[in-house]
Amino acid sequence: MAVLKDVKRLVVKVGTSTLVYDNGKTNIRRMHKLISVLSDIENSGIKVTLVSSGAIGVGTGKLGLPERPKDTPGRQAASTVGQCELMYMYDKMFSEYGHKIGQLLFTKSDVESPERRKNLINTFDTVSYTHLRAHET
C-alpha cells in the first residue's frame, strides 16, 4: 500500500463493463476480486467509497433478456431488479470480509439544491464515519 500511504479516503467507480460479461451474466469472479481489494484497502485504514453503476446490466441478465432494454420503462424495470441483486451481492461479499455496507442514492438535483446538497453531505459524512459503504446510482 506504499502508493496510497498519504491517502485518507479513496473513491472507486465501477461500471457495467466491470460487473457484467458481454453475454449479460454477472462477472462474479471480478466482483469478488474488487471487493477483496477494496476490503484490504479499508482494513489498512483508508476509508473507501464504492460508486457503482451496473444495475441495468445486472438486471438485464437476471431477467434473462436477450439485450439491454432501449426504452425507458424497460431500462427502469431492469434497473429495479438489478439494483436489488447488486446490493445483495455487495452486502454478501463485503460481509465475508467483516464490512457492513449501505446505499446512498441521489440525483443531480440533490447536488444542485443548496439545502439538499447540505443534507446529502451530512448523510455522506455520517455514512463515512460509521464505515459503511456508500453506493450511488
How would you label these PLM feature ranges?
Residues 109-110, 114-118, 128:
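Hydrophobic alpha-helical hairpins/lids featuring a short glycine-rich hinge
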Residues 122-125:
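A short aromatic-anchored loop/beta-hairpin motif
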Residues 130-131, 135-137:
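Conserved small/polar residues in nucleotide/adenosyl-binding loops
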Residues 61-83:
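A charged helix-plus-loop insertion that forms the helical arch/lid used to bind
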Residues 11-13, 47-59, 101-104:
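Short beta-strand segments at enzyme active-site cores
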Residues 1-49:
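N-terminal glycine-/serine-/threonine-rich phosphate-binding loop
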